[in-house]
């Protein structure tokens, strides 16, 4: 038998609220009529439904209104929510919400990269400006590992939490990120790092003046203070070794990221991945941080370096010239700035290729029965087909912006 109809007010955002039975028509609101039908063994129940909807028979579709789940009563192209009844929080949310997925992802990458530098370089500033009294190289490694983890936690649900142009490039090469999004991701990452460097500089401005007397170009201190923001090589390092350092260190980073996010592998639950990526960065720093400070991220190095160029350190931040270090230092690496940019991009591509050819391309046809996938931005169609074939049961796929989940039905 048919229950009394209720009216549902539907907004363009997908939220719905139940309206009174007597429908108050608002010109900027779309209402839908729904009828709840209870089916029993009594023939009268079905007859009631047919009789109740006899007058609403649609000859075009051949269906009665009672056979439809919803029927629009009032339509409008204007705002679906009555602005007069919105709370302040709802109004702010409505005014500030961005409709473009790419713009939201760019904001997420900006904020994640900002968090990475504001914590990571903040630790470096504390160690350098206190002359080691408030930390050491281990503190820097731990601080950067935690900074990476928090940055990925913040941005991961929206953009994947790359925070690194080299990682974004590798994901694009693997087909996990559309190429059209790559320039936007990179721009957001560089912008976030530059802004974060400005915050670190402002917070430690007085301590910096106390350290170098306000002279950013002083020969015996400029590189140590500029090194708060960007990487600089040891005086014994040749450019060939520095480039190899960045290529291989970043390839290790990319191999680890792909292993952690590959659901066919023995990866962790999705919520643990940012912590393990932070541990991976910390391990790279502990193993390969001596030569040049393991930038392994073009935005992390070039963004703050651009800030130091504008904030008083001058062109030395790019030329690497320092007369206070023995004479052949400048001849060994006359221009260091390009190595932490080119090296990580090459290294990320190398790491992606290594993982693909050694691991990713060799999974058995029917891998273990994975009931839930949480991988961010990648196509899971192959996994879904394999799981359905193995279980011999249909698979219902629920797709959202951030994750793709599959379960048995």
UniProtKB/Swiss-Prot annotation:
Superkingdom field: Eukaryota
Pfam family name, one: MIP
Compartments reported by the entry: Cell membrane
Region feature (Disordered): 1-24, 47-74
InterPro entries in the record: Aquaporin-like, MIP, MIP/Aquaporin, MIP_CS
Keyword entries, A-Z: Cell membrane, Glycoprotein, Membrane, Repeat, Stress response, Transmembrane, Transmembrane helix, Transport
Residue ranges of the motif NPA 2: 297-299
SUPFAM superfamilies registered for this protein in UniProt: Aquaporin-like (SSF81338)
Induction note: Expressed in early embryonic state, adult active, and adult anhydrobiotic state. Transcript abundance is high and expression levels are not significantly affected by desiccation or rehydratation.
GO MF term list: glycerol channel activity; water channel activity
Position of sequence motif NPA 1: 164-166
Residues listed as glycosylation sites in the UniProt record: 215
Ranges that cross the membrane: 110-130, 138-158, 184-204, 241-261, 270-290, 339-359
Family matches, as Gene3D superfamilies: Glycerol uptake facilitator protein
Function of the molecule: Aquaglyceroporin that may modulate the water content and osmolytes during anhydrobiosis.
Domain-related comment: Aquaporins contain two tandem repeats each containing three membrane-spanning domains and a pore-forming loop with the signature motif Asn-Pro-Ala (NPA).
Annotated family: Belongs to the MIP/aquaporin (TC 1.A.8) family.
Name of protein: Aquaporin-10
Organism taxonomic ancestry: Eukaryota, Metazoa, Ecdysozoa, Tardigrada, Eutardigrada
Gene, per the UniProt record: AQP10
């Amino acid at each position: 038998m048919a229950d009394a109809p209720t009216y549902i007010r539907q907004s363009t955002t997908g939220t719905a609220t139940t309206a009174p039975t007597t429908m108050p028509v608002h010109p900027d609101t779309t209402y839908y009529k729904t009828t709840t039908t209870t089916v029993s063994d009594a023939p009268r129940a079905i007859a009631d439904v047919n009789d109740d909807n006899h007058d609403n028979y649609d000859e075009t579709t051949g269906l009665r209104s009672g056979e439809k789940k919803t029927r629009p009563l009032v339509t409008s192209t204007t705002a679906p929510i009555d602005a007069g009844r919105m709370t302040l929080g709802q109004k702010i949310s409505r005014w500030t919400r961005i409709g473009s997925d790419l713009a939201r992802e760019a904001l997420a990458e900006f904020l994640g990269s900002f968090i990475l530098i504001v914590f990571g370089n903040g630790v470096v500033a504390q160690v350098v400006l206190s002359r080691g009294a408030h930390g050491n190289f281990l503190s820097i490694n731990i601080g950067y590992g935690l900074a990476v983890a928090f940055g990925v936690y913040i941005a991961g649900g929206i953009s994947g939490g790359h925070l690194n142009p080299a990682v974004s490039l590798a994901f694009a090469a693997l087909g996990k990120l559309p190429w059209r999004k790559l320039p936007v991701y990179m721009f957001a990452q560089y912008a976030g790092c530059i802004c974060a460097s400005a915050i670190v500089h402002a917070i430690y401005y007085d301590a910096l003046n106390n350290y170098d007397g306000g002279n950013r170009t002083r020969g015996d201190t400029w590189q140590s203070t500029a090194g708060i923001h960007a990487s600089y090589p040891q005086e014994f390092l040749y450019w060939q070794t520095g480039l190899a350092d960045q290529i291989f260190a970043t390839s290790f980073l990319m191999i680890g990221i792909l292993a952690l996010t590959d659901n066919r592998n023995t990866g962790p639950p999705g919520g643990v991945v940012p912590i393990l990526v932070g541990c991976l960065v910390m391990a790279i720093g502990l193993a390969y941080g001596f030569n040049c400070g393991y930038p392994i991220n073009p935005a992390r190095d070039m963004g703050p370096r651009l800030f130091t160029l504008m904030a008083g350190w001058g062109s030395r931040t790019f030329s690497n010239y320092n007369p206070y270090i023995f004479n052949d230092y400048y001849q060994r690496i006359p221009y260091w700035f390009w190595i932490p940019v080119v090296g990580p991009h090459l290294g990320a591509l190398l790491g992606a290729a290594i993982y693909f050819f050694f691991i990713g391309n060799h999974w058995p046809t029917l891998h273990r029965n994975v009931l839930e996938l949480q991988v961010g931005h990648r196509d899971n169609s192959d996994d879904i087909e394999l799981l359905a074939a193995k279980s011999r049961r249909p698979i219902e796929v629920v797709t959202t912006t951030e994750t793709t989940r599959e379960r048995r039905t």
